[in-house]
């Protein structure tokens, strides 16, 4: 009898070891596809990113980073219901995940669900375990901007830049706020700081053109306009310039 029991134990242990090894192989494969998906996402190759992130989840359905990355990809593709679904999956898998709280809070504010988004981000901003508080505070600033509370937005964004003076999204938002407040020199200063850490976008160029025009810097206006038309010819900002040009 004891030999039979021992044999059963050995079989159970062997099966458990096989399952553990198989699961490890799946998890390792999931991590590889997650890294590939994130890389393709950063390069703007959304089709390849989607394929790899979905494979990562197929290999390991509990991969929180893969679900968060896929949610962000769906946002880029304007598939907001699919993005919400991914965020809600992560909420069930790991409700205390700080990256989830930050991204989901931002997502909710972008969808104009301000009460839910601000509540989630404010909770995170009081969490001492948050290793990137400037991102959280910037997202709070963006929420407040969406709500029309420019004063609170500026307060949060200023705090974010005190925590990380090189954080590009906060610099970009402060450039826009300064321009809207007719504080053109400050807008230009924030742009120059932004350009030290991030590339130009059609939006930054558009604000730069308006800012330099307000400051009377005609040479800079021509340079920024030319850069916009050459590098982003199909952007809405370039179309606006072309439509307003007397030589169109």
Give short role names for the model-derived ranges.
Residues 17-35:
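Bacterial Sec signal peptide processing site at the extreme N-terminus
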Residues 25, 59, 93-94, 127-129, ...:
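Structural marker of alpha-solenoid helical repeat scaffolds
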Residues 42-43, 76-77, 110-111, 127, ...:
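Register position in tetratricopeptide repeats
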Residues 196-248:
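Terminal, low-structured helical/coil segments at or just beyond the last alpha-helical repeat
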């Amino acid at each position: 009898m004891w030999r039979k029991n021992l044999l059963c134990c050995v079989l159970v242990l062997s099966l458990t070891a096989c399952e553990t090894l198989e699961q490890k192989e799946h998890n390792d494969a999931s991590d590889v596809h997650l890294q590939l998906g994130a890389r393709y996402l950063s390069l703007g190759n959304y089709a390849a990113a989607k394929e790899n992130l979905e494979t990562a989840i197929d290999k390991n359905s509990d991969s929180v980073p893969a679900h968060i990355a896929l949610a962000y990809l769906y946002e880029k593709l304007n598939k907001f219901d699919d993005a919400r679904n991914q965020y809600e999956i992560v909420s069930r898998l790991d409700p205390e995940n700080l990256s989830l709280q930050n991204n989901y809070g931002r997502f909710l504010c972008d969808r104009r669900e301000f009460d839910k988004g601000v509540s989630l981000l404010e909770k995170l901003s009081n969490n001492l375990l948050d290793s990137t508080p400037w991102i959280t505070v910037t997202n709070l600033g963006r929420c407040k901007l969406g709500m029309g509370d420019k004063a609170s937005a500026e307060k949060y964004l200023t705090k974010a830049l005190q925590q990380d003076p090189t954080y590009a999204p906060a610099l970009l938002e402060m450039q826009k706020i300064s321009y809207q407040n007719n504080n053109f020199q400050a807008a230009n200063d924030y742009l120059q700081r932004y350009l030290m850490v991030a590339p130009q976008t059609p939006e930054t160029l558009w604000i730069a053109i308006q800012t330099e025009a307000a400051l009377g810097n005609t040479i800079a206006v021509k340079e920024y306009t030319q850069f916009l038309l050459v590098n982003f010819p199909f952007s809405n900002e370039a179309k606006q310039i072309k439509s307003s040009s007397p030589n169109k």
